[in-house]
Amino acid sequence: MVVYFSLGTNLGDKEQNLRMAVQKIRKQIGEVISLSAFYATAPWGFSSDNTFLNAALCVDTALAPLEVLQTTQEIEREMGRTHKSVNAVYSDRVIDIDLLLCFADDDTPVLLDTPELKLPHPLMQIGRAHV
């Protein structure tokens, strides 16, 4: 399965945070097929003096989508993220890893609508550049 992620950070050494997240994804989820350049964005959905550094990532994995989600949440905790955004209340964070899209081995899009995971990521539809 091929999965697409967006990564974002607006605390600490942002470039190092992204590099560490990519390294952990490579080790725990699968082979990195491609990685975008890092790019800066303003906070979305809340006010902060800290701009975000973001990246997009494509990974080949043998994990199922919910396993990928659980693993990314473990990585976020390992890196110091103490809470997830709830009810669209956002805050500064060391790392945010969003699972955007998944494609099965036959290139069929994986569609999910569960309480834990929605694929494709619902905020992709509103044009959020860094989801």
What positions do the PLM features span?
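Short, charge-patterned binding micro-sites
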Residues: 36-60
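N-terminal beta1-alpha1 ligand-phosphate binding loop
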Residues: 1-29, 36-42
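A general structural signal for well-ordered alpha-helical packing
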Residues: 18, 22, 54, 69-72
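Small-molecule pocket liners
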Residues: 3, 55, 128
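Structured loop/turn residues at secondary-structure junctions
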Residues: 9-10, 60-63
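A structural signal for short, well-ordered beta-strand segments
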Residues: 7, 35, 55-57, 97-99
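Flexible, gly/pro- and Lys/Arg-enriched active-site loops
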Residues: 44-51, 63-130
